[in-house]
């Protein structure tokens, strides 16, 4: 088990887009559909979760901004509650951190190194499902894996997370509710709080 600060770097693409961070990478941009890599943004330090209202629909931009304290229909869990669920194996942990694909048309001879992603040990990484607008292909990917991970049981506890102040986990938890899942858990503080309480992390690969 590895206990380290999450540090990930994604190589600059030919178009000049970079994704970087210590799992504190900024997930922002305009109202775009995935899988456009997110751009760098700064979290507003003045806003607080209890002042952020729940939107009627999904967040489609500025994904690294303070999130609401609630998600209607879901249960918000603390790091300690998430730890207890993880220890007894009573919930499926689903990481929705975005994954930057290999840039197309790389110059000949360029070596592409897949960026490492460290997350909660034994979690399932469903990459790029947290954007506000999903392609039909990505939404089908999400539905298929939720069906698989829940074993077809709509009451199976599903815990969604990303980073602290990351709307992608909020979006995905909201989508799961719209699909009829009734035991949706939102770990809003994500891997940041997980590490702060000394819980283990491990390298994950996206679910195919």
Each predicted region: which residue ranges?
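Surface-exposed acidic loop/strand-edge motifs in secreted or periplasmic proteins
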Residues: 96-100, 105
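Short hydrophobic beta-strand that contains or immediately precedes a catalytic carboxylate
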Residues: 82, 90-97
């Amino acid at each position: 088990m590895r206990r380290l600060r999450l540090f990930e770097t994604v190589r600059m693409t030919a178009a000049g887009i970079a994704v970087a961070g210590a799992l504190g990478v900024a997930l922002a941009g305009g109202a775009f559909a995935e899988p456009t890599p997110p751009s760098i943004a700064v979290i507003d330090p003045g806003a607080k979760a209890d002042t952020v209202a729940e939107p009627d629909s999904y967040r489609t931009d500025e994904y690294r901004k303070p999130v609401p304290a609630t998600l209607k229909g879901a249960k918000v869990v603390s790091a300690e509650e998430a730890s207890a669920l993880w220890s007894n194996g009573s919930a499926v942990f689903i990481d929705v951190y975005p994954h930057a694909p290999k840039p197309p048309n790389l110059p000949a001879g360029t070596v592409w190194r897949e960026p490492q992603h460290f997350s909660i040990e034994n979690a399932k990484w469903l990459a790029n499902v947290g954007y506000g607008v999903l392609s039909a292909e990505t939404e089908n990917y999400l539905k298929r894996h939720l069906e698989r991970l829940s074993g077809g049981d709509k009451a199976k506890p599903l815990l969604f997370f990303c980073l602290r102040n990351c709307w992608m986990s909020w979006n995905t938890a909201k989508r799961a509710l719209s699909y009829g899942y009734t035991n949706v858990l939102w770990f809003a503080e994500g891997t940041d709080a997980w590490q702060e309480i000394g819980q283990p992390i491990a390298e994950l690969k996206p679910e195919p």
